[in-house]
């Protein structure tokens, strides 16, 4: 049973120190901007004040380059918070000649990891941003960069899906097996509910290219145990999803999936929590 959206949002309260890092489309780290995010509850947590400060090269010892605040008493339809505090937000509709974007966020004790995926008006992936955050005054640490080897094996978990039209949320068991089949290729078999999907990827360093489906996809393996799974090109009248993963520890991986139908309408968000079983 999932808690309500606001209660799950409150699991993000606190002061989070971190950075916004621009990632190239090939997974290279570019500019990084130090940040402090405060989420503070008032009026018995019926009001939440959001404050984001971004800093220059001098870091926290210098005045912020930007300081943005906003107050929330309710959340918009486009954002879903799950029981762990993880969230999925983004565009409600893929429209012609318009930018499209999604943000995913995970919470694990004194850590948060957020990720932004942006597409230009022509539907091409244009910008990806990795946001690594640590609760202030804790010894929270960054995870190692994600590798193919860390993904290999069998994983079992539960997928929690919330629908945009507010039909009842669903849970289903998941099983995923990832094998190295040689020649710089891997095979992935994913089962959820009564469906099984099999795909193969070409390994190019820290990039996995999935090219055998209706939409070519690329998974970037990134610092802090993160991964970004995106279509290379968004097309009208073709359903799609964007996904972000986080290897919370060696034996637990979480994924956030935001799905759109062939009309370009956002239809659901899914949070998957998987544990290594082999």
Please annotate each region the language model reported.
Residues 5-9, 20-278:
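Soluble ligand-binding/transfer domains with enclosed cavities or grooves
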């Amino acid at each position: 049973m999932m808690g309500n959206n606001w209660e799950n949002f409150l699991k993000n309260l606190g002061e989070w120190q971190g950075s916004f890092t621009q990632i190239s489309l090939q997974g290279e780290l570019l500019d990084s901007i130090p940040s402090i995010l405060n989420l503070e509850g008032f009026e018995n947590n019926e009001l939440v004040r959001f404050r984001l400060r971004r800093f220059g090269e001098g870091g926290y010892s210098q005045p912020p380059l930007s300081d943005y605040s906003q107050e929330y008493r309710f959340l918009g339809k486009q954002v879903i918070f799950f029981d762990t505090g993880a969230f999925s937000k983004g565009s409600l509709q893929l429209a012609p000649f318009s930018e499209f974007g999604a943000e995913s966020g995970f919470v694990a004790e004194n850590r948060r990891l957020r990720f932004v995926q942006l597409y230009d008006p022509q539907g091409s992936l244009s910008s990806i941003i990795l946001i690594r955050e640590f609760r202030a005054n804790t010894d929270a640490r960054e995870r190692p960069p994600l590798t193919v080897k860390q993904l290999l094996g069998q994983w079992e978990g539960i997928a929690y899906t919330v629908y945009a039209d507010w039909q009842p949320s669903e849970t289903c068991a998941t099983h995923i097996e990832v094998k190295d089949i040689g020649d710089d290729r891997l095979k992935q078999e994913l089962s959820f509910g009564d469906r099984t999907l099999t795909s193969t990827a070409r390994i190019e360093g820290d990039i996995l290219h999935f090219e055998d489906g209706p939409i070519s996809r690329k998974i970037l393996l990134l610092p802090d145990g993160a991964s970004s799974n995106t279509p290379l090109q968004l097309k009208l009248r073709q359903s799609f999803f964007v996904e972000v993963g986080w290897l919370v520890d060696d034996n637990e991986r979480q994924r956030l999936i935001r799905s759109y139908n062939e009309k370009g309408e956002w239809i659901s968000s899914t949070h998957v929590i998987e544990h290594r079983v082999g």
